[in-house]
Each structure stands twice: as structure tokens, then as C-alpha cells.
């Protein structure tokens, strides 16, 4: 059967979410960005009114204000955007059960066979677009094709509020004349290397010698050559927590730090989040890894093997040991991260029971007791919010 794949891409998602609760910004240049006093002072998303002034994602605020002095800046609210994303995915699930979320603001839908229910693909895309707008007040663009790559490319051709079909038979006319930089999967470095090989358009890439591309670019060369020819056999795969290979948290710091005590407090908070996520998915891992990036943008990663766990204390303990061994006070730290991986398979399908969590028994294992305490903490946080409970070291630090 001929496959029909949609890529639904939410237009200017973060700032569009903000416009649903700040209608006063509609029609005015506006963007979501961090505090200009620290490193988060970059544009995360700008609306189309701001883009007319040349405002782009990742642009620093002081440059943006020169281009568009009257731009309205709204600080990011990622919890709000995650909720809106969840609502969008809920609407999409009414049209097909086969959905692959590609990011917070886009997803592939396998619509193969759905014509009998919803009609032709273009009309179905119109229904989805109107449904999202009427229910959530958000706009999207939709790409339609026979595979994921071409659907993704099609979704980028008309923004905002565009519906574009791009079938393989049409790529010579619609896709090949475009510059290689437009192609999904090609970043600045790859584009530069392609131009050094005199490859400027997607068509030139499609017709270039595949073996030479592989020689110069490795696996990437083979992949982008295939994509340029409209070939992508990958299925639309709904994600499951069982697919998770690693759970990690990192933070780019507002200011560089040089003292290890501050780093320990940050690592505790990150470990807390990793442990909470691991317990949510009932994932016990036996590999802890830390990532340290310095102000000069050099970075190191270290990992160690531990007894499988999802407990914060054990994740943090392994992280601290590696942090202390590798701390260099002469190199200011810009980013810290910690992750848990190497998950065992046998306990993935077990349910964490609230009754088991809270039952009073005679167990003497300190690990088991900590397990129960942390699971109880998770349930409290779920009800009252993440910040309701903090470790003593975090509270002490915040008071200083």
C-alpha cells in the first residue's frame, strides 16, 4: 500500500503559546527569550512580525534590540509549552494512533489507510490545522509525502499555515533546485564541506558520486545522498519509555563557577531530577556519567559503573566522586550534566505500587527504605509541584 505520512510543525511554537494567554502581543513584534543579563539572553522563538525585522532564533538580545527596538520580550515558561505540546499531541491522536513525536513542536503521523475515514490527504490536513487552531489557538504547517524525510521537507516550504505535498516523483522540480542548506540533516559544517566539493543544490547532491561522498563524509554522506534522492524507509515509530537508553539532565550556568561546593549543589539538583525521571519510568541503571564544559568550550565526560539503581543518593554519590577527581579550579565551568544509563530489562514492566511504597514493614535494608522515601517524595511533587521538597544542601545554599 502507498504510504501517506504527515509532518505537523507548530509555527513559532513558544511565542504562539504565549499569545494564547497574552493576546495583547498579537500583531506586534514579540519573542520568547531569557534574561539579557545572563547567557540565556538569546531568542528562543520570534513571531513572524519580529522576523520581518530580521530577528532570528539564537540571536542575542542586544543585537535584536538594535534591529527591532519595540520588540516585546517574554521569558520562557517551559512547563506551559510542554502542556500545550501534550494538548497538540492529544488532538493528533484523534486522527491516527501511529504518531512519532520528533520534538516539542512537531510530529510525524502515519496516515496510511486513513483516507477511508477522513477523506483525501489534503482535506485531512486542513481538518487537523483547523482543529488545532479552534481548540488551542495555535497555528501549524503540514507536510505530506510517502516518507518521513520528504514530509519534513514539505512542512518547511510554506510557513506559516501551509499545507504542502511533496511526492518522490516531484522532487526534481520542487526539491532539487533548493540549496543544500535547506535540506533537513545538513548543518553548517556539512554544507561547507559540500560546497568545497562544488555541491550547491540538493539536485547536485542527489546526482553526485555516492562512494566519494562516503569517503569524505562517512555514514552521513550515504544518508544525505539517499535523502536527496527522496529515499527514506524509516517507519513512523511511537516512542515508549522502554526505548529510553539514557536519562540525563544538564544546565548551562548563568555565570561561570570555579568553586567545587557550588558545583556539588548544582549536581545534587540535577541528580534529583534524573532520579525522579528514572523512578517515573521504573528504570534502574548501572552507569553514571558526568559532563563538564568549561568557559573555553572544551569539555570532558567521565563515567563509572555502580550497582543498578534509580536512587538520587547513589546517582549523586557516583557523580560527586567523579567530579572531585576531575575538578580543576583553574578552569571556570560553564555547563554541568549528569546521566544514568545501562538500564536492566527485567524490571521495566514492573509497576511501582503506591501500597508497596507506603506500607510499614520490618525491612532493614537502608536502600529499600530510601527507595520508598524517594518514591513517596515523587508522589508529593506530582501533586504539589517539583519545588515543594528540596534537599537540605539545596535549601542551605539558597539561604546563603
Curated annotation (Swiss-Prot):
Identify the SUPFAM superfamilies for this entry: DNA/RNA polymerases, Lesion bypass DNA polymerase (Y-family), little finger domain
One GO cellular-component annotation of the UniProt record comes to: cytosol
Question: Under which EC number(s) is this enzyme classified?
Answer: 2.7.7.7
Which cofactors is this protein said to need?
Mg(2+)
Q: Where is the UmuC domain?
A: 5-187
Q: What Gene3D superfamilies is this protein classified in? A: 3.30.70.270, 3.40.1170.60, 5' to 3' exonuclease, C-terminal subdomain, DNA polymerase, Y-family, little finger domain
Cofactor note as given: Binds 2 magnesium ions per subunit.
Q: What class of enzyme is it?
A: transferase
Active site positions, chain numbering: 106
Which residues take part in binding Mg(2+)?
A: 9, 105
Give the location in the cell.
Cytoplasm
Report if keyword Nucleotidyltransferase is assigned: yes
Q: Which UniProt keywords apply?
A: Cytoplasm, DNA damage, DNA repair, DNA replication, DNA-binding, DNA-directed DNA polymerase, Magnesium, Metal-binding, Mutator protein, Nucleotidyltransferase, Transferase
Record's InterPro entries? DNA/RNA_pol_sf, DNA_pol_Y-fam_lit_finger_sf, DNA_pol_Y-fam_little_finger, DNA_polymerase-Y, DNApol_IV, IMS_HHH_1, Rev_trsase/Diguanyl_cyclase, UmuC
Q: Mind telling me which CDD domains this protein's record contains?
A: PolY_Pol_IV_kappa
Spell out the reaction equation it catalyses.
Answer: DNA(n) + a 2'-deoxyribonucleoside 5'-triphosphate = DNA(n+1) + diphosphate
Question: What is an example of a GO molecular function annotated in this UniProt entry?
Answer: magnesium ion binding
Q: Kindly list the residues the record flags as site (Substrate discrimination).
A: 14
Q: Which HAMAP family match?
A: DNApol_IV (MF_01113)
* Quaternary structure (record): Monomer.
Q: What does this protein do?
A: Poorly processive, error-prone DNA polymerase involved in untargeted mutagenesis. Copies undamaged DNA at stalled replication forks, which arise in vivo from mismatched or misaligned primer ends. These misaligned primers can be extended by PolIV. Exhibits no 3'-5' exonuclease (proofreading) activity. May be involved in translesional synthesis, in conjunction with the beta clamp from PolIII.
Q: Return the protein name.
A: DNA polymerase IV
Amino acid at each position: 500500500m502507498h504510504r501517506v505520512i504527515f509532518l505537523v510543525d507548530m509555527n513559532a511554537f513558544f511565542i504562539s503559546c504565549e499569545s494564547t494567554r497574552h493576546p495583547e502581543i498579537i500583531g506586534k513584534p514579540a519573542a520568547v527569550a531569557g534574561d539579557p543579563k545572563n547567557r540565556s539572553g538569546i531568542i528562543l522563538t520570534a513571531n513572524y512580525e519580529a522576523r520581518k525585522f530580521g530577528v532570528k532564533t539564537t540571536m542575542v538580545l542586544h543585537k535584536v534590540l538594535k534591529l527591532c527596538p519595540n520588540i516585546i520580550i517574554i521569558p520562557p515558561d517551559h512547563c506551559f509549552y510542554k502542556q500545550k505540546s501534550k494538548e497538540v499531541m492529544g488532538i493528533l491522536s484523534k486522527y491516527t494512533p501511529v504518531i512519532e513525536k520528533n520534538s516539542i513542536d512537531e510530529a510525524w503521523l502515519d496516515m496510511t489507510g486513513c483516507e477511508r475515514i477522513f477523506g483525501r490527504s489534503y482535506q485531512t490536513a486542513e481538518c487537523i490545522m483547523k482543529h488545532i487552531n479552534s481548540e488551542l489557538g495555535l497555528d501549524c504547517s503540514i507536510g505530506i509525502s510517502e516518507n518521513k524525510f520528504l514530509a519534513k521537507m514539505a512542512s518547511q516550504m510554506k510557513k506559516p499555515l501551509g499545507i504542502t505535498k511533496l511526492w518522490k516523483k516531484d522532487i526534481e522540480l520542487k526539491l532539487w533546485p533548493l540549496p543544500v542548506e535547506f535540506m533537513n540533516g545538513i548543518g553548517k559544517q556539512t554544507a561547507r564541506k559540500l560546497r568545497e566539493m562544488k555541491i550547491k543544490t540538493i539536485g547536485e547532491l542527489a546526482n553526485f558520486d555516492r562512494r566519494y561522498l562516503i569517503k569524505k563524509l562517512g555514514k552521513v554522506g550515504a544518508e544525505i545522498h539517499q535523502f536527496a534522492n527522496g529515499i527514506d524507509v524509516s517507519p513512523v515509530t511511537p516512542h515508549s519509555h522502554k526505548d529510553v537508553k539514557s536519562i540525563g539532565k544538564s544546565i548551562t550556568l548563568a555565570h561561570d563557577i570555579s568553586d567545587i561546593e557550588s558545583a556539588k549543589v548544582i549536581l545534587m539538583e540535577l541528580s534529583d531530577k534524573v532520579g525522579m525521571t528514572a523512578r517515573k519510568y521504573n528504570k534502574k541503571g548501572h552507569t553514571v556519567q558526568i559532563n563538564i564544559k568549561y568557559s573555553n568550550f572544551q569539555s570532558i565526560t567521565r563515567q563509572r559503573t555502580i550497582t543498578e539503581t534509580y536512587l538520587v543518593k547513589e546517582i549523586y554519590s557516583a557523580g560527586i566522586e567523579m567530579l572531585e577527581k576531575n575538578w580543576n579550579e583553574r578552569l571556570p565551568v560553564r555547563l554541568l550534566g549528569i546521566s544514568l544509563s545501562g538500564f536492566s530489562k527485567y524490571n521495566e514492566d514492573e509497576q511501582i505500587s503506591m501500597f508497596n511504597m507506603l506500607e510499614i514493614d520490618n525491612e532493614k535494608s537502608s536502600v529499600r527504605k530510601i527507595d520508598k522515601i524517594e518514591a513517596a517524595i515523587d508522589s508529593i511533587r506530582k501533586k504539589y509541584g517539583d519545588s515543594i521538597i528540596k534537599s537540605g544542601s539545596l535549601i542551605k545554599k539558597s539561604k546563603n
